[in-house]
Amino acid sequence: MATSMMTTLPQFTGLRPQLKPSPIQGLVAAQPMTRRKGKGALGVRCDFIGSSTNVIMVASTTLMLFAGRFGLAPSANRKATAGLKLETRDSGLQTGDPAGFTLADTLACGTVGHIIGVGVVLGLRTLCM
């Protein structure tokens, strides 16, 4: 019954609506799929899960989390001295991890790992251009 009804659904071209009657098919009006190319300086590519970009991002984030967890990088419980040696201190943050790796450490190391990964990906792209 709903498939034979005619209704006016607003159709947009740019910012201005164009009102024209169109048949309702189920609950969703059928729209043709069109591919649009990015207009900006950066284009988005969705590659497969084993792509080079994905491997770089996973590796850089994993290595940074590993370094933070096992005491190779400064964290909330280990501060760096002037000679870049890590010394243990009490940060006052509660954690259930035996090494004292906190949520703040996880977020910070994950962020730095992503920054390193993006730098590697963009650096390799400029070399290939």
From Swiss-Prot:
Q: Where are the transmembrane segments?
A: 48-68, 104-124
State the InterPro entries in the record: PSI_centre_PsaK_sf, PSI_PsaG/PsaK, PSI_PsaG/PsaK_dom, PSI_PsaG/PsaK_pln, PSI_PsaK_pln
Q: Where is the transit peptide?
A: 1-46
Looking up Pfam families in the UniProt record yields: PSI_PSAK
Q: Give the bilayer topology.
A: Multi-pass membrane protein
The superkingdom of the source organism is: Eukaryota
Q: Which GO terms describe its cellular component?
A: chloroplast thylakoid membrane; photosystem I
Give the record's GO biological process terms.
photosynthesis
Where would you find this protein in the cell? Plastid, Chloroplast thylakoid membrane
DNA-binding as a keyword of this entry, yes or no, is no
Which keywords has UniProt assigned to this entry? Answer: Chloroplast, Membrane, Photosynthesis, Photosystem I, Plastid, Thylakoid, Transit peptide, Transmembrane, Transmembrane helix
Q: Which Gene3D superfamilies match?
A: Chlorophyll a-b binding protein like
Indicate the family of this protein.
Belongs to the PsaG/PsaK family.
Q: What is this protein called?
A: Photosystem I reaction center subunit psaK, chloroplastic
**Which organism does this sequence originate in?**
Medicago sativa (Alfalfa)
